[in-house]
Amino acid sequence: MGLTTFLQARRDAAELGEGVWRRAHDRFRRGLDRFHQILERLPEGEVLEQTIPLANELADLLPRVRAVAAAAQAAAPSSSTDVPASRDGRWSELHRALSKAGNAVAQCAEALAMMRCSGACASGCAKADAVSRRVAAVVEQVAAAEALLPGREQPQPAAPAVPAPADSAA
């Protein structure tokens, strides 16, 4: 282990702890690393050009995930595999959103690998669209996690539309 790796590990431990928030962040980072490893093996061409902006979009999410995990660690410290308890279930929901984001990044890497293995495709390739849809799911989960941070308003579920009672005039 080099000096920079050692210093990064200490910085991560101080900022993210050793519990569920650190694990959620690390899961996201590993999925992102895997996505970029697969991207590096794509042949030059249209598919690579379509995929690079998606890779950049995913990479831009890592600091946001780190900020969410650090804020969660500061507000509800975790040093084990147990999600901290809360009356309103906020920490469970936040952890669920971060976990879903990490899983969605892994699915992005999987979709990219499947696209790579299937070879070249015609313009308007549906396989590239699959990767794009998965990236959109990652963005959605990260935004959901950010919305659950303390100090941000909880999204209220929309009230169901109840039809007005009909006047029974006889």
Language-model-detected regions and their locations in the chain:
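Secondary-structure edge/capping motif, primarily at the C-terminal ends of alpha-helices
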Residues: 35-46, 65, 69-86, 112-123, ...
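Long, charged/polar, soluble alpha-helical segments
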Residues: 45-82, 100, 107, 153-170
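C-terminal amphipathic alpha-helix
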Residues: 112-170
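Leu/Val/Ala/Ile-rich N-terminal alpha-helices, chiefly Sec-type signal peptides and the beginnings
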Residues: 1-55, 59
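Non-catalytic sensory/regulatory segments that transmit input signals in bacterial signaling proteins
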Residues: 49, 85-89, 128
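Hydrophobic multi-pass inner-membrane translocation pores used for secretion
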Residues: 81-95, 169
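Charged, amphipathic alpha-helical oligomerization/scaffolding segments
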Residues: 23, 27-34, 50-53, 57-60, ...
